[in-house]
Amino acid sequence: ALLAGLLSHVGLLDDRTREYSGARGARFALWPGSTLAKKRPDYVMVAELVETSRLWGRTAARIDPAWAEETGAHVVKRSHSAPHWSSKRASAMAHEKVTLYGVPLVADRVVGYGRIDPEAARDIFLQNALIEGDWRTRHHFFRDNRALIARLEELEAKTRRRDLLVSDEQLFRFY
């Protein structure tokens, strides 16, 4: 319940400096009297930030970053990178990074790219699944098209001609 009002007081432990990276670039340490000061959990929420000789976080609690992502859904920033085809999932996928006021909550989650950019996901599907054939499916059209392409490649080899099979670009436009 407190997390909803203290989203800007979430911190991620930096193992090198033994400090927490907080919202908007703030760096703080847990108050030495805190029971969590020696345990050093990865993610904490503090009730107050007090600046004396350095910035201290007091009244701390260990949190799960998924809680902050869910509670702060209206303020988290999501960035997506490296869209690619996953033959295992038979879908276009991308890597997602989720931050809350600059604090990384999720570093490298693989998500479906169709929700993010449907047109680009369709292009990835067409290129990788239908044209390159990297798709395990029971659809008859796909099996028939692959068989036709194999027959045309065989015919090209027999006749020593390279103009029977259309290019990948033409196949892309066809689909």
Predicted region positions:
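Extended, charged helical/alpha-beta scaffold domains that provide interaction surfaces
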Residues: 1-175
